[in-house]
Every structure is written in C-alpha cells, then in structure tokens.
C-alpha cells in the first residue's frame, strides 16, 4: 500500500525529506530544552519502523536475503522511504540524549538488527535486504547531522532564563 502511494506520488518523498531537513533542526532546538517530550516523541517515531519492518505479512518469502548496494535517488521511492524512516528517531534520540554519535550508532545497529530478525524469521513474510540497511543508515546519518545542528543552535542561542518557552 505504501509503495503504491509513493509510486503514484513521486514528489512525496522529496517533500518529506525537505521538511525534515528544514524543520528538524528547528524542532530539535525546541526539544533540546524538553528532553522528556523528545523521548516521548522518539518512542512514537519507532512505531512506523516496527509496523513497516517487523509486523508479519501474508506474502511468501522467495529469498532470505537480497544483497544489493544502490544509493537512493528521488526516482527510487522505496529507497527514499527507507532513508526517511530513520531520520526522525535518530534526530529525536540524539537531541534527547544530547549524543548524536550514540544515536547514529543506535540507528545503524538497530537497522542491522531488523534485517537480522527478518532473515532469521521467515514466518514474518519479510526478507532482509542489505540495501534496506544501507538506506536506513543514510537516514540515521542525516538524523544525527540534523541533531548536531539543533544541539549547536540550542547551545549557541539558549532560551532566556525565566521563560517557559510558551507564547
């Protein structure tokens, strides 16, 4: 269903990525001062990953693991979707923990773990793919870079003492 939507609307993935790149550091700077909220939103951002990668499907797995190394382009909608999938959780975890490198490693290792589960659990109806790991890892790098920018901005322009952040 999601692949069909993305193929029908090829502009969707680039727009979402642009929103994340432009809005991520701004939202991250705001969340820097609200780590509890950042952790809550981080937990919510894991839901699409679980639903799209670990929920069983009815399809039959024809091959256990596919080995391919294609870089994402705007024309390859599924690859772009895999990139986008990992940007928010890594961004949010990095801002909440104030450790972009740790969040980046978590995203890369988490993606590898998902692919391992898919490879070892044929009953899921999903097959592992090295390209999924690659594109998820690219998304994790983007998320960590955006978090670094947000953390830098929050430290460079700290909120004023005595303000609640509400207007």
Positions of the model-derived regions?
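Bulky hydrophobic segments
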Residues: 1-126, 145-167
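Loop-to-transmembrane alpha-helix initiation sites
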Residues: 128-133
